[in-house]
Amino acid sequence: MSFENYFPLWNDLNTAQKKLISDNLITQHVKKGTIIHNGNMDCTGLLLIKSGQLRTYILSNEGREITLYRLFDMDICLLSASCIIRSIQFEVTIEAEKDTDLWIIPAEIYKGIMKDSAPVANYTNELMATRFSDVMWLIEQIMWKSLDKRVASFLLEEASIEGTNELKITHETIANHLGSHREVITRMLRYFQGEGLVKLSRGKITILDSKRLETLQRS
């Protein structure tokens, strides 16, 4: 499918706006592990994912990563165009978790259209509100939910994304997602293994008891 099929506001644009986007649209293929945007880069623009998977995260003062949210096929990333939204005051990094094909609408192009189009402005505000809701939910999890529940939730989410209970993922990667230390995650996973919830092997975690993990995350 083409960009027009992926961009939800295409039919709300006038002919001139459609031409402006088409003339300036950037198509990009990025490899797994590529940093697409970080707080020190210029305003990248609006990202629309054709296929693949991105992770948006922040860095603590100690250099620890914590995932804000992940993006999948047909998702739109606004934080990569933070310069057009004055309310965004924090720096984020966006990384490709898988090989990803995406489109980029340059920030100035999108900003101009947003000023002239009420549907685009409304959609942008709604999407930003959704993302901030995701971030507030994450903060609530960090503050009030114990680490064992957060690890259980992460493993179940990862299994759902990958479509398998055999997860090719390192303890360091989980720590980066959850804003923790690798050693702490390793101890928790070893505890899970002792309880028969998972099986650990080099570079892989196999979920053995999804139902008990679900019970744990809800408790």
PLM feature spans:
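Glycine- and acidic-residue-biased ligand/ion/polar-headgroup-sensing regions
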Residues: 33, 44-57, 72-74
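Cyclic-nucleotide recognition modules
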Residues: 69-125
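Cyclic nucleotide-binding regulatory module and flanking cytosolic helices
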Residues: 1-31, 71, 76, 81-85
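Short alpha-helix-to-loop micro-motif enriched in aromatics/charged/Gly
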Residues: 61-68
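Phosphate-/nucleic-acid-contacting segments
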Residues: 147, 156-219
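Short phosphate-coordinating micro-motif centered on Lys-Gly-acidic
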Residues: 36-41
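Polybasic "coupling" helices that flank or enter modular domains
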Residues: 97-98, 115-180
